[in-house]
Every structure is written in structure tokens, then in C-alpha cells.
Amino acid sequence: MFESGAVVAAALGAAGASLEPAQTQPNGVDLTVGAVFTQTSRGRIGRDGKHVGDRTKLEPDDGWYQLEAGTYVVRYGEPVRIPTDHVGFVLPRSTLLRNGCTLDTAVWDAGYEGVGEGRLDVGHGIDIEAGARIGQLVLARADHEGTYDGTYQGENR
């Protein structure tokens, strides 16, 4: 079962997030654009390890990211802490979808802490203001063995 937006907001508050009242929704919390990147070199995913390719951070023009069609990495503006008895998912806000764009993210495991990232696919050029709400974090109760202890723990803090 998914939790209420108030439960998600409390989890983010415990991670140090300063949320605006409008970010708390009935079933989750809106995440904002903290930074946007383009990937500039190949990454590597092998059986024995991984490497994320180099990136270039885009600078907003007068507070706005003017994005052409393509794939970007977005870093969210809020620190996140997934409670140990939950799993997190980030879904795109409907206005993003209605403008031909989407967000892709992986499962956010129980115990993950950090300032997460996702893939922003822009199907047609769009202007996105820095700090704009683009995704919604939802939490669901989950049974599991252990908590997240991977290489991305504490990322971007």
C-alpha cells in the first residue's frame, strides 16, 4: 500500500529537506530540479563493477533550463531518506508528460539516503525553471531482507 503525502514529507524532512507546502500531495511529495547534466563520455556496467560516464552540468539561463530534444540527467533538489520498511518510486508529474517529456528512475531501496538522480527524456524542446516540480516521490511498505548499502549511498550530499 502506498503512503500518504504527509508520511513521505516526514521522511524527507528527516533527511533535511526543506519543503514548500505545495510540494506535499495527497499520495507523495513533488521533487524539484536541482541540477541538469548531459553525459559526455561512455559509462561502463560489468559483472565486476560499474562506472558512470563523465557529465557536464548545464547552467540555467536567467533561472531557466532551455532543453532541446534529447536525454539528460536531472539531480533532484531534495535530500531523500527512504524508511527502512519502505521502497520509493519517482514518477513524472503529469505536466511533464503533457509536454512530451518523462522521467525514468530505478527503485529507491529501503535505507537509501542521498540526493537522487533520474533520467529526463525530452521528446520536444522545453523550458524548465530551476527549482520547478517535475517528479513525485511515493513510498510503499515493503518486506525485505536488509537495507540499501550500495555505492550511491549518501550521493550528492
Language-model region placement:
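DUTPase catalytic domain/fold
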Residues: 1-157
